[in-house]
Amino acid sequence: MSSVDTEKPAPPPLETEAPPPPPPPPPPPPPPPPPPAGYSALDVVLRILLLGSAVASVVVMVTSVQTKLIAVAGVPVLVSNKAKFQNSPAFIYFVAALSVVGLYSIITTLASFIFISKPSCSTKTILHLAIWDVLMLGLAASATGTAGGVAYVGLKGNSHVGWNKVCNTYDKFCRHVGGSIAVALFASILLVLLVWLSLFTLYSRIRK
């Protein structure tokens, strides 16, 4: 009589499921929208005008030199005296400040041309430009106001403290100073427009 095999057959091996594939990487964020073409063109035009006005203002102030023969108390003869911008610290500050504004306008004009050729200008870059424009506006406005105050005293005098007006003697010098201050005021207005333009562009991007 044969023996019965009581051993149970081994169960078939369990099929292991393959691990699921890793999820696909998220798509890259879309590039920032380029500034409108009108913005870039207007920005370049304003910065070129700013450069021209800053340079013109400095040149007119530096060339404001006039020599006159004036009467000095206690001296029997007329004395030659030269009026120039170096005689006033306010005018020296004016020339230095507008020179900085002119140098800044050169740099930012070149940057604006680059933004036109590569319109993917980031919002951070426009924000930095707006901040620097505000700083240059403060510099130009303070220099214009300081020089304007001194020029007004030279034109009208101040009877309360005994300051005599000098523009009746140094007429050419005063015309140069007045023209330079007027051009600097125009440069300040251009900087205001540049700040508004940058802020409007930032607002348009944030709204989107």
Swiss-Prot record:
Keywords: Cell membrane, Membrane, Transmembrane, Transmembrane helix. It holds the Pfam family CASP_dom. Residues 1-41, 111-133, 202-208 are cytoplasmic. Residues 63-89, 155-180 are extracellular. GO terms for cellular component: plasma membrane. Its main location: membrane. The chain crosses the membrane at residues 42-62, 90-110, 134-154, 181-201. It comes from the Eukaryota. It is a multi-pass membrane protein. InterPro entries: CASP/CASPL (IPR006459), CASP_dom (IPR006702), CASPL (IPR044173). Residues 1-36 are annotated as: Disordered. Residues 9-36 have a biased composition (Pro residues). It is found in: Cell membrane. Belongs to the Casparian strip membrane proteins (CASP) family. Homodimer and heterodimers. This is CASP-like protein 1D1.
